[in-house]
A protein has these predicted regions:
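Canonical tetratricopeptide repeat
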Residues: 3, 38, 72, 105-109
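Conserved structural position within tetratricopeptide repeats
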Residues: 24-27, 58-61, 95
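Position-specific recognition of the canonical hydrophobic site in helix A of tetratricopeptide repeat
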Residues: 9-10, 44, 78
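TPR alpha-solenoid repeat register
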Residues: 35, 69, 102-103
């Protein structure tokens, strides 16, 4: 459920169905950081930034050493004007040895922020 919902979220398709799948997975496994991240990320991708923040904060609590989850939280912080916290999360994500593609994206955000 979560995998398909997250994949759809990343592709920007079937977002209503994706959210339903992810919420179902989150209800079944509320302590799974990856599923919690997916829920926060679908909220972010559908411009519900303030709603996404506490969920992504929880995801980071559950999976503190995951670069992608820290990056997602940084993005959400930026969108709700919490820029210092966003920069902190992005810098933290960089220290977790993300793959080259993610590292490059984060470095751009550190230089220019998000649009």
């Amino acid at each position: 459920m979560n995998y398909l919902g997250y994949a759809w979220t990343e592709q920007g398709i079937n977002l209503t169905k994706a959210e339903k799948l992810i919420r179902k997975a989150a209800n079944l496994r509320p302590k799974d950081g990856y599923i919690t991240d997916s829920l926060g990320w679908i909220l972010y991708q559908t411009a519900r930034f303030a709603e996404a923040v506490p969920i992504l904060e929880r995801a980071v609590q559950l999976r503190p050493n995951d670069a992608i989850i820290n990056d997602h939280l940084g993005d959400a912080y930026w969108k709700v004007e919490r820029h210092l916290e966003a920069v902190y999360q992005w810098r933290r994500a960089i220290t977790m040895n993300p793959d080259a593609e993610l590292k490059e994206k984060i470095e751009k955000k550190l230089s220019f922020g998000l649009k």
